[in-house]
Amino acid sequence: MIYVDNRQEKMEVSDEFTNHLEKVIEFALKEEDVNIPSEISLLFVDNEEIREINNETRNIDRATDVLSFPMLDYPEKKVFKEVYTENDFSEADFDGDDLVLGDIVLSLERALEQSKEYNHSYEREASYLVVHSVLHLLGYDHMEEDDKVKMRKREEEILTALDIRR
């Protein structure tokens, strides 16, 4: 289950755009071996709101493109498909029958800015940011160079499989 909450008014959000991002999320989960019903919240915000959230949660007082708030714990350098192969969850990890993976907070305003900066489509940039965030929800990180390489490789593999290119 993907819950979408549009909390901004600067960018128009069509059903087609929302449906596309939901499909991207579902595909990324499948590619990462999430084989049980799960729940992700996808929040659309503007630069000001993501700046506030970034400041409150990370003490970084600037806008960013996407924030990820995973609900599951992962050992260092481990991801979902390495840790939860036996679907070994506690009851607290669920909302009804759905495993709660976490929240994605996406600045659509920043996604548009970056699409122009990187000279590709707005849809491609939003798709990339959503895949990036899903991977964070599943334990991927990019603080260390080896982790960054691993995460970037998975992002590109997933986007390429979806035929989403620069």
Swiss-Prot record:
Keywords assigned by UniProt, alphabetized: Cytoplasm, Endonuclease, Hydrolase, Metal-binding, Nuclease, Ribosome biogenesis, rRNA processing, Zinc
GO terms under cellular component: cytoplasm
The protein's name in its UniProt record: Endoribonuclease YbeY
Pfam families given in the database record: YbeY
Keyword Lipid biosynthesis set for record: no
GO terms of biological process kind: rRNA processing
Coiled coil: none
Gene of this entry: ybeY
Native source species: Clostridium botulinum (strain Alaska E43 / Type E3)
Residues given in the record as Zn(2+) binding sites: 132, 136, 142
InterPro entries with a match to the protein in the record: MetalPrtase_cat_dom_sf_prd (IPR023091), YbeY (IPR002036), YbeY_CS (IPR020549)
Enzyme Commission designation: 3.1.-.-
Cofactor(s) the protein requires to work: Zn(2+)
